[in-house]
Amino acid sequence: MTTLPEITVQELQQRLAAGAALVDVREVDEYEQGHVPGARLIPLGELPGRVAEVPAGEQVLMICRSGARSAKAGEFLIGEGRDVVNVAGGTLAWIEAGFEVNTGNQP
């Protein structure tokens, strides 16, 4: 089993500013209630059928509510040949750090 690398929400903010891709694997209702600006929604249960939507050839950042589902998603995607990093603490840590969140269904 591969150890999934992790970054902090502070590192996430820096990487997003540099144009990194972020995938949120929570459910639609969770995403709509509040998500990191720019995060693309691909619910964990849909991920196996939507792997092609995850950018290849670049590192992709994964996020969920607390970091558990995104870690599972990351391990799966590593097996699919993707380069992924998990966001430690997830959206809860992002909000706790005082960063902006978007609501609704648009990234």
Task: Annotate each PLM feature.
Residues 1-21, 27-59, 68-107:
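Rhodanese-like catalytic fold shared by cysteine-dependent sulfurtransferases
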Residues 63:
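Short, surface-exposed ligand- or partner-binding patches at beta-edge/loop junctions that are enriched
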